Amino acid sequence: MTSASNPPAFRLETSDGDEEGSAEVNKGKNEPPPMESPFQGEDRNFSPQIKVNLNYRKGLGPSQQDPNRFDRDRLFSVVSRGVPEELTGLLEYLRRTSKYLTDSAYTEGSTGKTCLMKAVLNLQDGVNACILPLLQIDRDSGNPQPLVNAQCTDEFYRGHSALHIAIEKRSLWCVKLLVENGANVHIRACGRFFQKHQGTCFYFGELPLSLAACTKQWDVVTYLLENPHQPASLEATDSLGNTVLHALVMIADNSPENSALVIHMYDSLLQMGARLCPTVQLEDICNHQGLTPLKLAAKEGKIEIFRHILQREFSGLYQPLSRKFTEWCYGPVRVSLYDLSSVDSWEKNSVLEIIAFHCKSPHRHRMVVLEPLNKLLQEKWDRLIPRFFFNFACYLVYMIIFTIVAYHQPSLEQPAIPSSKATFGDSMLLLGHILILLGGIYLLLGQLWYFWRRRLFIWISFMDSYFEILFLVQALLTVLSQVLRFVETEWYLPLLVSSLVLGWLNLLYYTRGFQHTGIYSVMIQKVILRDLLRFLLVYLVFLFGFAVALVSLSREARSPKAPEDSNTTVTEKPTLGQEEEPVPYGGILDASLELFKFTIGMGELAFQEQLRFRGVVLLLLLAYVLLTYVLLLNMLIALMSETVNSVATDSWSIWKLQKAISVLEMENGYWWCRRKRHRAGRLLKVGTKGDGIPDERWCFRVEEVNWAAWEKTLPTLSEDPSGAGITGYKKNPTSKPGKNSASEEDHLPLQVLQSH
């Protein structure tokens, strides 16, 4: 398989006269040059090369005035116009000069574009009559590096070939012609322009098959897979390890039009794969990050294609490709079985863990409310509720002890460790400090372990882990305050009370266990992160600027005895027994406190008579009131109202995401990690594979009420809703039920049906 990374074999080229271009190489470009432009000529900047001069000895090589001499400009002009008659004599010229069409003399300097690429770029009604003659001439010249597989060599278009261009031009005729003449169908276009990064780019999976699929050309896809010359492989991967299915997931953008096209192409490729290579599970192929197409959709936040893969249901010959099976239905009521492979947190790097901790999309909360994730997380939550409330009770007891100890703090002069004559209260106070220290160490280790496991996605953790960051700060303050307490440093007390305040604020973390308080907590978090932080940033800038200005003006005070129009700036020193009148704004802190009163509407514009520039001070105070009290506060209120309204539509799903994070944290908790994980669902037979082997899946039952598509007739696995008696149900053959295993009753159909 030819790859763009394989360097061509070295060959000494020939020169028969003055070559176009120069030896300068443009190194200052940060943008990709155009592959073909009617407004810009071909680049003449070539890399310096050593060549054999055929005119070194008189009589060798053609004359400079030879009318049959083919240079790059002449050749590019002929192929761009599509006039094959003007290629007459090209083969003889190449043989006479020992040249090939892939030599640097016939390629563009900046991109390495060949005459064949030039011809494909200038198709007329999908054809160019010069393509076949060029291929024949190149083959007859004995080129060791065939023109049909020549690639661009610059950093932006590296690996780009004529086959890629033909597919991009949507010319099936050209694709067939190139493949019939030996084009490599697995060549990779791996330049910067074809990689996913910020800026102008188009990532399609590098391979010709992926390009055809991403540009919605099913006829080209079919030909590449079924042609008799060199069929493309659905298992082929690009430099990132992505298959054509991964590439389709990457180009999805959640819009209705794009999603419909991507889903149709995705399903068609799966069905084609089932016919061509029935033993290969295309959706189980992982890229270099260990992600299948389903996991990649979860990580990138491609909601629509993610929904389709989870809920895909086929009938007939392609039923083994389904991930959803209708077990039983009656009118709009439907009992569905969802395949849990790669979904449940029982597996490593599962879809649930990716959505909760590794997803980059700001809309990932919309994925946890999709079935079967919604019911799966609810089942896990119901099983882990006792553990959640046990953690809540332990934390509440810890905070009560913390509060009692902080409330009964002795004077700073007393020693931290009581003497032998200490009272019972002093001993209990010391015990309380020890318990606080141990609790702080436990919280600190837990939060450090939380962020260490997410060190590769630390930015996502900081954006979403609101309470985890507060818990970390609380633990640091707690441990530091207790250390300072035992070394008898008085600064332990401010740190202690700060940790106490944070501790009670962090009690809101456990409100996510209840729907109403959890949604309310979500709104508070969003308002703080979106609006309040921006307001504080702008407000602190205003506050500092005006505070410095007022402090500077307050230093210029007038003597009380001097007339108001006096120009002197020196004040009389107070006599003995006479107190000096304080200036209104003696320092930045005092000025900031006074200005804060104006912000909340409690300030007074009255000021002492000794201020020299009273008019300027008055104008500054009025400007400050207008900018903060009138403008900033009202903008904050308006933005908070808008945030609450926008979050209200997604607050339920955001709360579900927070519950999912809590569920996974409890499953992966430090003290529970050694216990065997619970595996949801049941192992059952859902059909028969093409080779006659029973199709057994680990499935999860979900009851649904769907009035939108209830008239659609789907094959069912059972005639009645009784799940315990249907054929194909069996326990896990590899293990016996344990404490964490679900009982038979846990998997019976739910009694309460909820409409979605």
From Swiss-Prot:
Residues 732-741 have a biased composition (Polar residues). The modification Phosphoserine is found at residues 15, 77, 743, 755. Its main location: membrane. N-glycosylated. Abundantly expressed in spleen, placenta, skeleton muscle, lung and brain. Residues 1-387, 450-455, 512-532, 638-756 are cytoplasmic. GO terms for biological process: positive regulation of axon extension; positive regulation of calcium ion import; positive regulation of cold-induced thermogenesis; response to temperature stimulus. Calcium-permeable, non-selective cation channel with an outward rectification. Seems to be regulated, at least in part, by IGF1, PDGF and neuropeptide head activator. May transduce physical stimuli in mast cells. Activated by temperatures higher than 52 degrees Celsius; is not activated by vanilloids and acidic pH. Residues 409-428, 477-490 are extracellular. It holds the Pfam family Ion_trans. It catalyses: Ca(2+)(in) = Ca(2+)(out); Mg(2+)(in) = Mg(2+)(out); Na(+)(in) = Na(+)(out); K(+)(in) = K(+)(out). GO terms for molecular function: calcium channel activity; monoatomic cation channel activity. PANTHER family: TRANSIENT RECEPTOR POTENTIAL CATION CHANNEL SUBFAMILY V MEMBER 2, TRANSIENT RECEPTOR POTENTIAL ION CHANNEL PROTEIN. Glycans are attached at residue 567. This is Transient receptor potential cation channel subfamily V member 2. The chain crosses the membrane at residues 388-408, 429-449, 456-476, 491-511, 533-553, 617-637. GO terms for cellular component: axon; axonal growth cone; cell body; cell surface; growth cone membrane; melanosome; plasma membrane. Belongs to the transient receptor (TC 1.A.4) family. TrpV subfamily. TRPV2 sub-subfamily.
